[in-house]
Each structure stands twice: as C-alpha cells, then as structure tokens.
Amino acid sequence: MVFLKKSLLLVLFVGLVSLSICEENKREEHEEIEENKEKAEEKRGWMSKIASGIGTFLSGMQQG
C-alpha cells in the first residue's frame, strides 16, 4: 500500500512538472507571436509613412 501511495505521488509530481513546462512553452510562444505582430505593424506604419512622403514629394515636383 505504501508503495502505491509513493508511486501515485511520483506520477502526480511528474505530471505537474510536465504541465508546468508545457504552460511555460505555450506562454513563450504566445509572447513571440505577439512580438512578431507588433514588429509587422511597426513595419507597415513606416512603409505607409514612406509611401506618403514619396507621394507628397512627387506631387510637389509635378506642380513645381
């Protein structure tokens, strides 16, 4: 009976440790995805500013 209790505790402990590791990996992946989204949005913002600047420059050259 004592052997079964120890075995059960060991199985529960190993299960909790592996669950904790999985949660940590999932959290890291989620943070990485969010970081990539932020970088992509930042790039889009810069590209639109550059395109707007080029458009303004070209329209100024046509008028002048």
Swiss-Prot record:
Q: Which residues span the membrane? A: none
Q: What is this protein called?
A: Phylloxin-B1
- Which stretches of the sequence are propeptide? 23-42
Q: Which UniProt keywords apply?
A: Amidation, Amphibian defense peptide, Antibiotic, Antimicrobial, Cleavage on pair of basic residues, Immunity, Innate immunity, Secreted, Signal
Which residues carry the post-translational modification Glutamine amide, per the record? 63
User: Could you tell me which InterPro entries the record lists for this protein?
Assistant: Frog_antimicrobial_propeptide
The protein's organism comes out as: Phyllomedusa bicolor
Q: What domain of life?
A: Eukaryota
The UniProt entry's sequence similarity note says: Belongs to the frog skin active peptide (FSAP) family. Phylloxin subfamily.
| Signal peptide bounds | 1-22
Where does this one sit in the cell? Secreted
* Chief location bin: secreted
BP terms from Gene Ontology? defense response to bacterium; innate immune response
What's this protein's function? Antimicrobial peptide against the wall-less bacteria A.laidlawii and S.melliferum, the Gram-positive bacteria B.megaterium KM, C.glutamicum ATCC 27853 and M.luteus ATCC 27853 and the Gram-negative-bacteria R.meliloti 102F34 and E.coli K12.
Q: Name one GO cellular component term.
A: extracellular region
- Tissue localization of expression: Expressed by the skin glands.
